[in-house]
């Protein structure tokens, strides 16, 4: 059964609420992986969305219209994601759908939103979510594309003089898309993939795959996964005593990975959105002020630091709000406004969307970081 969390204007100050009473609410839906395998992504996204809608309504909503945000948990299941999207479109009559947290659940919803002509803003990584653009007319996304991630990793390894690489990935849409794009980025940067192995998201041990890495001529290992798998394989990697760099992706950009991997996480290198190292950025960075503001608001509300995944939700919500504010309650005009958004300073990067690019983020949206003493440290 789908679980709905509804945010409205009930928590707004009385004067703002009174102003909103005469105007129809604007309805936005979100399908989030709050439980199940991708819960470590979905939980901070849910919390961020609830915080943002409360803050927005306290300030008067969108052009005086209160915002009703309905958040549905898809349980990290593709079938549940489709059902949730249909419910939001058919019953709630939402102007836009945000979600999902993961690539597989996001991809599963695309056909539904496209047929209904409803804008969708995913918070997941796979480039397939928005490509080819001609087949993704109604679909946008806020997480950095795995094309960007693959290129960042490949360039980093090449700069370190590494040639031979082992690649291990989750056997799902996230891992498969990462593998496809890393297989393109590697040769373009003079790298050889000497071994490619998969593991299931439910696996509790990846020693057999890592034993093959140890027996290969790999000089570095790239892992494409999210917690808990990403943490398990990191521990296995250390237990086997593999003496080479371990590179992961923005899929580990949360406290869950650090907690689950423990000391084994130290030394892991990954391209990340700037949120995890916001305080270490130069003051000239165009995102720094927005990042620090999000951290402050989230910590005040939840007594915890936000994750990069919460940042993807932050951007999805604010992009939708901006587009609705410009276009009004018209799905087609909202879609068009999204596509014309440029110079939008978000948490995941500075977005420059267009008819050719429904993600709008480049390699400058990410930095290389290393985990030292359980903390993210900027490498560049």
Identify the function of each model-found stretch.
Residues 24-27, 64-68, 91-96, 115-120, ...:
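Loop/turn elements at helix/coil->beta-strand transitions in domains of secreted/extracellular proteins
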Residues 83, 128-129, 137-241, 284-285:
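Extracellular/periplasmic Venus flytrap/periplasmic-binding protein
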Residues 88-101, 121-123, 166-169, 217-227, ...:
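Periplasmic-binding protein-like
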Residues 234-312, 375-378:
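Extracellular/periplasmic periplasmic-binding protein-like sensory domains
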Residues 297-310, 321-375:
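Segments of small-molecule ligand-sensing domains
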């Amino acid at each position: 059964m789908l679980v709905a969390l509804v945010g409205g204007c009930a928590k707004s100050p009385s004067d703002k609420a009174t102003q909103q009473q005469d105007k129809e609410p604007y309805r936005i839906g979100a399908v989030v992986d709050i439980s199940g395998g991708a819960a470590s992504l979905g939980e901070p996204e849910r919390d961020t969305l609830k915080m943002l809608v409360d803050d927005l309504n306290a300030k008067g909503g969108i052009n005086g219209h209160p915002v009703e945000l309905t958040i549905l948990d898809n349980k990290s299941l593709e079938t549940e994601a489709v059902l949730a999207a249909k419910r939001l479109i058919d019953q709630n009559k939402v102007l836009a759908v945000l979600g999902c947290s993961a690539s597989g659940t996001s991809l599963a919803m695309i056909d539904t939103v496209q047929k209904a002509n409803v804008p969708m803003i995913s918070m997941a990584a796979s480039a397939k979510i928005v490509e080819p653009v001609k087949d993704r007319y109604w679909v946008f996304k806020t997480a950095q594309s795995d094309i960007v991630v693959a290129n960042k990793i490949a360039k980093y390894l090449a700069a370190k003089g590494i040639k031979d690489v082992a690649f291990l990935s989750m056997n799902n849409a996230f891992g498969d898309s990462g593998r496809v794009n890393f297989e393109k980025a590697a040769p373009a940067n003079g790298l050889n993939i000497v071994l490619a192995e998969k593991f299931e998201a439910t696996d509790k041990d990846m020693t057999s795959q890592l034993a093959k890495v140890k027996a290969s001529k790999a000089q570095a290992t790239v892992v494409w996964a999210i917690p808990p798998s990403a943490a398990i394989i990191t521990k296995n990697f250390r237990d086997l005593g593999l003496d080479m760099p371990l590179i992961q992706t923005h899929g580990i950009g949360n406290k869950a990975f650090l907690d689950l991997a423990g000391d084994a996480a130290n030394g892991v290198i990954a391209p990340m959105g700037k949120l995890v190292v916001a305080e270490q950025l130069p003051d000239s960075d165009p995102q720094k002020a927005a990042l620090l503001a999000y951290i402050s608001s989230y910590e005040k509300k939840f007594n915890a630091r936000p994750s990069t995944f919460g940042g993807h939700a932050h951007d999805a919500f604010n992009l939708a709000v901006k587009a609705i504010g410009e276009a009004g309650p018209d799905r087609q005009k909202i879609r068009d406004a999204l596509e014309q958004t440029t110079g939008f300073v978000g948490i995941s990067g500075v977005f420059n969307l267009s008819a050719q690019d429904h993600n709008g983020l480049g390699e400058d949206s990410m930095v290389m970081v290393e985990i030292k003493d359980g903390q993210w440290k900027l490498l560049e």
